[in-house]
Each structure stands twice: as C-alpha cells, then as structure tokens.
Amino acid sequence: EPDADPGRDLLSMAIINAALERRIPIFAICRGLQELVVATGGSLHRKLCEQPELLEHREDPELPVEQQYAPSHEVQVEEGGLLSALLPECSNFWVNSLHGQGAKVVSPRLRVEARSPDGLVEAVSVINHPFALGVQWHPEWNSSEYALSRILFEGFITACQHHIAEKQRL
C-alpha cells in the first residue's frame, strides 16, 4: 500500500505496549486508535470504502480544510465507560471523519466507548488502565471552540498529572 510505513508501525506498537505496561496515560487519535486496536490484538478494515454497509468516513481532499474537518456524523457513547465518565451529560455528539481504515475486530482488552450510526467503532478504552482512550475523530481540530474536545484533553492532562504524582510517591 502506498501509505504503508512498517517502520512507523513497529515503533508505534512498541511505544503503545510500553505505555500500557507502565500504565502511562494514552490519548490515541485517529491512526492512534487504529494502532491501539492492533497493539491490543484487534484488527482493522483496511479500506472502509469497500464495506458497503458503512458510511463514507474519508475526507474529501477537494474541500477546504475547514470543511474536511467539520463534523460529519454523530457518535453514540456507550454507557459505563471512560468516555461516558468524562462526558456524563452527553450520550451522543457530532465528530469529524477523516479516515479510510477502522476497527474491524476489537480485542477483549478493549472496551468500545462509542460507535457511529453505521456501527463502526469510533472510540475505545483499555480495560483496567487508568486512562488509555482512543478516538477515531480529530478532537485537536478547533479544540478551543469545542467544549467536548477540551473536556477530553483536560481528562488526559489530569490523568498525566495523577500518573506523575503517583510515580513521585513511590
């Protein structure tokens, strides 16, 4: 595949597994979610566009960047997970969608946190980890304008602060 980068993939898997083993907080975005799925034993749809039951999740490169990163579909949050704890008053919200691959099989080590209307996994967390969250969308885009994105980043920052404080106590 033209976009394949085996060296990057190996490095990503090593970093993810080291962070999981050391219980270091992870906030995996877009490809990061896909790498988290694979690192924990899951698999991917290599080309979502070849799955007729799924929505179009790729961006249109002909559009201005602002439109490419604009919200394009809703996600439904699963109850009882990390995402619902971070967003207790929010069971569904709109996200942008700029990916050609997506989770096919999710490892038993992961918990599905959110899905798009077509059933595709849009967010996962690692079970029994203080904060290892992967999202398929790009919350970093215009995050200063979206309270939901800020809440996710603040949750990650808080988890990092707790991790550092815990290490200092040891």
Model-derived regions: residue spans:
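Pocket-forming structural segment of enzyme catalytic cores
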Residues: 3, 41-122, 158-159
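Structured adenosyl-cofactor binding patch, chiefly the S-adenosyl-L-methionine
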Residues: 37
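The feature captures the ABC ATPase H-loop/switch
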Residues: 33
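Conserved G/P- and acidic residue-centered "switch" motifs that form tight phosphate/ATP-binding loops
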Residues: 30
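Beta-strand-turn-beta hairpins that frame and shape the catalytic cleft
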Residues: 109, 127-132
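Flexible gly/pro-rich beta->alpha loop and the following alpha-helix that scaffold active-site loops
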Residues: 1-27, 40-41, 45, 49-53, ...
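Acyltransferase
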Residues: 135-170
